[in-house]
Regions:
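Buried hydrophobic positions in well-ordered alpha/beta secondary-structure cores of metabolic enzymes
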Residues: 17-19, 32, 46, 103, ...
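NAD(P)H dinucleotide-binding glycine-rich loop of Rossmann-like/cofactor-binding domains
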Residues: 4, 41-120
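Conserved hydrophobic beta-strands of the Rossmann-like cofactor-binding core
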Residues: 35, 117-119, 186
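Conserved beta-strand positions in the Rossmann-like core of class I SAM-dependent methyltransferases
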Residues: 20, 141-142, 210
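Glycine-rich cofactor phosphate-binding loops and adjacent beta1-alpha1 units
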Residues: 110-113, 136, 152-219
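Mid-domain Rossmann-like dinucleotide-binding core that forms the NAD(H)/NADP(H) cofactor-binding site
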Residues: 89-168, 172
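Glycine-rich beta-strand-centered segment in the early N-terminal region that forms part
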Residues: 2-47, 81, 86-88
């Protein structure tokens, strides 16, 4: 159980749905519209919120962690968190907007073009980060995990280089793939100490490590 999650709680923070009813002053959507919404709940009153830095709200809550999520028949969403889906986009694709936004933002935190990249953690977010790095022109992208299933899914998504770290070390795999050039960008998406330590020990000096995961325990 993740210590940042308040139980009992309804799961579901990556979602889309159909609007059933709206308040009298709502103009961003109407009944029947297909929408998605940001899962972050902010106070709007603290200093970070007043500066527009809602991601570091002093009272930040996230659906499915500190507030109930979308895995229920009906739930209420504030209109300032809503985004209408483009015409013809399926609800399945709509539910991928939030994790895709995380992947796009993370991959844009440092310049990956022409560089060798390691993504530690092949879950949904890690998979998407690797795809965005490829799209942004990374030279080579290696994604690692302990799950062969996740790594197989990564290959299905076009990520050629995968590593199960229970079968070979990152140091060995990086040497084989990148040679003396090594790698210059690492993304920590697993949220465990051994993952970030492995990146720190194997990445080229003077390079960038982007920490994306929320750690259950301090590394």
């Amino acid at each position: 159980l993740h210590p940042a999650t308040f139980y009992p709680v309804v799961q579901g923070h990556e979602y889309s749905g159909v609007v059933m009813a709206v308040g009298s002053e709502v103009t961003v959507c109407k009944p029947g519209d297909h929408i998605t919404a940001r899962p972050q709940l902010v106070c709007g009153k603290c200093n970070p919120c007043k500066r527009g830095q809602y991601n570091v709200c002093e009272h930040l809550r996230v659906q499915a962690f500190q507030a109930d999520g979308a895995a229920q028949d009906f739930f209420v969403v504030d209109d300032d968190r809503v985004a209408k889906l483009p015409e013809g986009m399926s609800l399945d694709y709509g539910a991928m907007i939030e994790p895709s936004a995380v992947g796009a933002h993370a991959s844009n935190r440092t310049d990956v073009k022409g560089k060798n990249v390691v993504v530690s953690g092949a879950g949904t977010i890690g998979n998407l980060i690797a795809q965005f790095c490829i799209a942004r022109g990374a030279k080579n992208v290696l994604i690692t995990d302990v799950s062969d299933l996740r790594l197989a899914k990564a290959r299905e998504c076009g990520i050629k280089h995968t590593l199960n770290i229970t079968k070979k070390t990152l140091k060995e795999a990086a040497q084989e793939l990148f040679g003396e050039e090594g790698y210059q960008v690492g993304f920590e998406v697993a949220g465990v100490e051994v993952s970030i330590r492995s990146l720190m020990e194997t990445i080229e000096k003077g390079s960038d490590i982007v920490v994306v995961a929320v750690f259950a325990k301090d590394p």
